[in-house]
Amino acid sequence: ALGEPIRDDAVRFVCVSDTHSAIERMRQPIPDGDVLLHAGDFTRRGNTEEVDAFSAFLGTLPHRHKIVIAGNHELSFDPVTAKYGASCTEAACNEAVAQVKRRLVNCTYLQDAAATVCGVKVYGSPWQPRFHNWAFNLQRGQALLDKWNCIPTDTDVLVTHTPPVGHGDYCVRDRHVGCVELLNVVQNRVRPRYHVFGHIHEGYGTTTDGETVFVNAAICDVRYRPVNAPIIFDVPLPEGASKDR
């Protein structure tokens, strides 16, 4: 729980998502921890000013490790949406995306990639079922399954932007909008200790299937007010691991 001391024999994860360029105005301050996880939508539109402001704020936080993935609002991070309305070539568009990603200097950015922090294996991916013309959209079914099949089976903490179906995904339109394929991969193959996500602001909170704890860490509510508190959890420090690396 918030306020509990950080233990020497555990890795403290602090989870946020969907801060939408309001991370400096969060109603609940971000507590210290070993690892800060941001599950995407750290901007409103993904422009460079927003990215720079977010990166600068991350630099003020004390966490030794900061891991960030993109969400559907990071339009400049996806070559498909970065090209909307532009006449650039594919190569030029890809270079523009690479340049904006390099502006995140105070964190580890994961896009279909893994990182090991304090001996704990983390995997991050930004994709979600198609939603209007936002970034990192894929059709439900095989296209998304292909992405989730890249998740290593030894993942301890999975970070995606979309929720899996049935966990933190209940929308104000009275329906579950999470990803079926993601739930199947999480429950039947990967079985991580924790699955952290956001995207559905009204789905904030934690659930469990008895094996994995599902964490919707969306900070903003449906009116984009940064009212929710960060969610923290501790993972036992793996044998032989150190918090110094």
Tell me the role of every PLM-derived stretch:
Residues 82-91, 131-135, 153-191:
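Active-site-proximal segments of metal-dependent phosphoesterases and phosphodiesterases across multiple
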Residues 15-17, 36-41, 65-72, 110-111, ...:
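Active-site neighborhood of phospho(di)ester-bond hydrolases with catalytic His/Asp-centered motifs
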Residues 16, 21-117:
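Core catalytic region of metal-dependent phosphoesterases/phosphodiesterases
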Residues 116-118, 181-194, 201-245:
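Binuclear metal-dependent phosphoesterase catalytic core
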Residues 4-13, 114-124, 153-157, 207-213, ...:
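Beta-strand-turn-beta hairpins that frame and shape the catalytic cleft
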Residues 104-110, 137-149:
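A Trp-anchored, charged/polar loop motif used as the substrate-binding/catalytic surface
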Residues 1-25, 61, 80, 234-245:
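Acidic, histidine-bearing metal-coordination/catalytic regions of metal-dependent phosphoesterases
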Residues 76-79, 117-118, 130-132, 166-168, ...:
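Short catalytic/ligand-binding loop motif for oxyanion handling, primarily in non-cytosolic enzymes
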